[in-house]
């Protein structure tokens, strides 16, 4: 075989490969990058499972509520012992995220945290029409959620607090009663209470009363308002940092004045009334609010995200009804004194 033939054959064999080297290569599609909001949602979901605060908030927790690893573990052990030995508590959650609700609210005063746990379990037993059967698939509850009456906003405020928006005009008082309203609130609260960031930083409430009618006011008796506010203030492990009311009609003003008069002085100082949304936006960044209030994300999108979260945690919400306490036995119980008697060793641990 001549050298010319060999060269020709080699060229014919190599040419296709050579051509492929110069052809544009097919790009491998990249997995979609997460937005900052999506990344934060994943982080918060992991924190919720463990009860652990993110690194950037641990120093603040140490300063504000004396939280350190040794103190936290000792306090959790004390609360679990309290529950185990309590003659009136038949069943209760004992996981860290649940118990940390009470410890962080009471800044690691174990006796106060245990006392609040007693009250919390008791109120669920005494007022089941308000605090039990928190099922997102219940037709009435699902309809109220879908209407957008109560929505925790995806983004936190400037202080890092979870913001809960209520829109009274989206609750139909001709179809639903105060029990449905209370159960919707209880369900949303339970969904949020296990968030470590919120246990430390607290909550901001924005209540838009536009569309409020007299039937809304008549849903609640003065007695029920008094009882509910007592439950919220003294039995719910939730740090209420700021409450905004906006667009309150003249016939609703007296109702809210009465309600605010029942609050502790500390909570009274955290209530603000605004004439309109523009005034509200001076205190709450409109960027975190729904598009209808000056933000960028439509309220409908926020509602759909809430519905997904509620379904994800539905079993947890329903399992709350398995907790049980003998309310009558609570009055005869003196085990809280045992917690007080061990508080000295807890304080010693704080100082060591």
Summary of predicted features, one role per range:
Residues 1-352:
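Basic, amphipathic alpha-helical/coil surface patches used to engage anionic, phosphate-bearing ligands
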């Amino acid at each position: 075989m001549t050298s010319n033939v060999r060269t020709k054959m080699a060229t014919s064999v190599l040419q296709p490969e050579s051509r492929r080297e110069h052809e544009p290569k097919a790009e491998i599609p990249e997995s979609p990058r997460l937005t900052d909001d999506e990344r934060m949602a994943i982080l918060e979901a992991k924190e919720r499972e463990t009860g652990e605060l993110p690194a950037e908030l641990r120093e603040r927790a140490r300063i504000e509520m004396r939280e350190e690893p040794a103190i936290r573990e000792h306090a959790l052990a004390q609360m679990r012992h309290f529950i185990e030995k309590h003659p009136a508590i038949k069943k209760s959650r004992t996981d860290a995220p649940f118990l940390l609700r009470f410890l962080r609210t009471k800044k690691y005063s174990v006796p106060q945290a245990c006392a609040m746990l007693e009250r919390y379990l008791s109120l669920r037993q005494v007022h089941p029409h308000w605090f039990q059967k928190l099922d997102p698939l219940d037709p009435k509850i699902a309809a109220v959620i879908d209407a957008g009456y109560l929505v925790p906003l995806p983004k936190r405020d400037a202080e890092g607090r979870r913001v809960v928006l209520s829109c009274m005009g989206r609750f139909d008082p001709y179809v639903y009663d105060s029990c449905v309203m209370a159960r919707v609130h209880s369900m949303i609260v339970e969904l949020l209470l296990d968030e470590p960031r919120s246990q430390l930083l607290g909550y901001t409430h924005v209540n838009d009363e536009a569309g409020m009618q007299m039937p809304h006011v008549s849903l609640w008796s003065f007695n029920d308002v008094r009882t509910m506010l007592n439950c919220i203030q003294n039995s719910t492990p939730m740090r209420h940092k700021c409450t905004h009311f906006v667009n309150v009609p003249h016939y609703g003003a007296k109702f809210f004045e009465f309600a605010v008069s029942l609050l502790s002085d500390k909570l009274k100082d955290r209530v603000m009334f605004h004439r309109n949304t523009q005034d509200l936006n001076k205190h709450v960044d409109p960027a975190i609010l729904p598009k209808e209030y000056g933000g960028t994300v439509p309220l409908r999108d926020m509602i759909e995200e809430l519905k997904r979260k509620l379904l994800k945690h539905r079993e947890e919400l329903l399992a709350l009804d398995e907790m049980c306490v003998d309310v009558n036995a609570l009055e005869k119980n003196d085990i809280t004194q045992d917690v007080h008697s061990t508080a000295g060793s807890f304080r010693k641990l704080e100082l060591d």
